Amino acid sequence: MKSRLSFIILLMSLSISGYAQQIVLTPQWTAQSQFAGYYVAQELGFYKEAGVDVIIEHTSASDKALNRMLNKKCNAITMLLFDAMCQIDHGVELVNILQTAQRSGHVIVVRDDQIKDIEDLRGKKVGIWRSNFNQLCLLIEKDYNLNIEWITFIQNINLYISGAIDATMAMIYNELYQLRASGYENKKVIYLADIGYDYPEDGLYITREYYEKYPEKAVAFAQASRRGWQWAHEHPEEALDIVMKVIEREDIPASRRHQEWMLREVLKQQIPTGESEPRFELNHEKVKALCELLLKHGRINNEINADQIKGR
């Protein structure tokens, strides 16, 4: 009887230990090609082969990724580097284990044809997200003393189409496609990367608690995720099939053509300017440049370097 009880206790302890090591990943938005590499890693068994139990749970308008992490509903999220540095400075225990986007995907799409460059936005009405994606734009306004009248939106392009604004912020992989598909393919686009604001964006972050408690699992998770992204680079059409399967399962309205555009642009972002292959680690010089911008505008109080962000 005692041996049987000991066996049951052992099984329970193993089960609890396995659950504790489980990784719940929450991307910063609903299912789309922006997160293709993670879907690939899960669908093709890369996580399982690496010995990590990964569940992907998407966010919603009322349950943001960072809030889910802070409330211990997940222990891994995707996040912009800009936002991550601010959160780390404010005491949030985050560790970057994989940097996916090496280049900026932020653009300004002009509607008023009199606007030729960033200086021409002075005093204009410009659409902007009601989310953390808006932070870099606000600092650029201060750098150029533009006195922009920001008009907030959540995710659609209706303000632009209606003519209520003179220009709009957009992501190269999302709203830019929507605008071009709506007949605005010839409008001028100002790429933030071209005016000196080319900072890394999306990265994969895990709680410091998990990183320190299960370092081997954290590394295996990062490596399997990287493998998923690399596979997406080599098999974009098949990766898109996997994305569409996830989108259908999540019951998200989305067109394959839009997701194809998004995947292509997201994969481009992973290749540093002037190079031909993707990189999946932080660029120390770009982190330093972004840190200087954040310090200049009082968004962070302490200098943060790439090693700190990587938990070293």
Stretch-by-stretch model annotation:
Residues F82-D83, Q155-I252:
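Pocket-lining segment of extracytoplasmic ligand-binding domains
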